């Protein structure tokens, strides 16, 4: 079994201009994310997929493996799939390029089920437990929530607070979805060939395309939260946390 981490890295970004090249203690943000990914124990290879010659150049200088992908791709999963065709592999991990604080052990949580006994998962992802009284987070449409079945497979993902709390129950479980995925190679190829689904378009959540088409997404619980970078304020916070963690 050969697991490959692919990090999609577009130069254009809507909220924070060219964030992949933002400085993080002397290195571009995307280089810091790649450095963390290379510490994974289960992945045999880490590849960055980009549409930018500038990103390509800084990563090659850092020693990373980089592939160029089409600038016309509309989402990170399409970029992962195009890179997968170039590099080959059995399992492909989609790791966001703006997560320089990702714990390598967290990445391995998503990969591990593909190395276990029994049938291989279609896809795995991560969820972070929330407390029922964390209403501000649960009600936030920018925070994607997940509900799971008793085997840990996703029943649904939504920007709405799910499950809806009609009455207070002490055992109600809430999960925040963490957007790291590991795909079986054939599932990734099938996924990007499918048209956007109704629920996907309604929620603006591409993972719903898998669920609507009968694929299972196994959710692994993690207690390690990983901040991303979408605003200048979040970048400053990640810089502070990076200095604390790595002593830069």
Swiss-Prot record:
GO BP terms in the entry: CMP-keto-3-deoxy-D-manno-octulosonic acid biosynthetic process; lipopolysaccharide biosynthetic process
Pfam families: CTP_transf_3
Class of the enzyme per the UniProt entry, highest EC level: transferase
Pathway: Nucleotide-sugar biosynthesis; CMP-3-deoxy-D-manno-octulosonate biosynthesis; CMP-3-deoxy-D-manno-octulosonate from 3-deoxy-D-manno-octulosonate and CTP: step 1/1; Bacterial outer membrane biogenesis; lipopolysaccharide biosynthesis
Record key words, sorted: Cytoplasm, Lipopolysaccharide biosynthesis, Nucleotidyltransferase, Transferase
Domain of life: Bacteria
Family to which the UniProt record says this protein belongs: Belongs to the KdsB family.
Catalytically driven reaction(s): 3-deoxy-alpha-D-manno-oct-2-ulosonate + CTP = CMP-3-deoxy-beta-D-manno-octulosonate + diphosphate
EC number(s) from the headed UniProt entry: 2.7.7.38
Molecular function in Gene Ontology: 3-deoxy-manno-octulosonate cytidylyltransferase activity
Gene Ontology cellular-component terms listed: cytosol
Underlying gene: kdsB
InterPro entries documented for this protein: Cytidylyl_trans, KdsB, Nucleotide-diphossugar_trans
Cellular compartments annotated: Cytoplasm
Protein's name in the database: 3-deoxy-manno-octulosonate cytidylyltransferase
Protein function: Activates KDO (a required 8-carbon sugar) for incorporation into bacterial lipopolysaccharide in Gram-negative bacteria.
């Amino acid at each position: 079994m050969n697991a490959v981490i692919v990090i999609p890295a577009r130069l254009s970004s809507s909220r924070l201009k060219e964030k992949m090249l933002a400085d993080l203690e002397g290195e571009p943000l995307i280089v810091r994310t790649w450095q963390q990914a290379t510490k994974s124990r289960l992945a045999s290879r880490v590849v960055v997929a980009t549409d930018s010659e500038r990103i390509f150049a800084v990563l090659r200088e850092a020693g990373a493996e980089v592939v160029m992908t089409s600038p016309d791709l509309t989402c990170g999963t399409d970029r992962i799939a195009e890179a997968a065709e170039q590099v080959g592999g059995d399992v492909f991990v989609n790791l966001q390029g703006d997560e320089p604080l990702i714990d390598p052990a967290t990445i391995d949580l998503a990969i591990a089920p593909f190395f276990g006994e029994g049938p291989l998962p279609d896809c795995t992802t991560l969820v972070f437990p929330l407390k029922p009284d964390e209403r501000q987070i649960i009600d936030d449409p920018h925070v994607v929530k997940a509900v799971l079945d008793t085997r840990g497979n996703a029943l649904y993902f939504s920007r709405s607070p799910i499950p809806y709390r009609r009455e207070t129950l002490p055992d109600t479980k809430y999960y925040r979805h963490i957007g790291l995925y590991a795909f079986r190679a054939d599932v990734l190829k099938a996924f990007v060939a499918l048209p956007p689904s109704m629920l996907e378009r309604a929620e603006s959540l591409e993972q719903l395309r898998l669920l609507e088409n009968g694929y299972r997404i196994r959710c692994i619980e993690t207690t390690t939260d990983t901040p991303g970078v979408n605003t200048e304020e979040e970048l400053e916070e990640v810089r502070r946390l990076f200095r604390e963690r790595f002593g830069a």
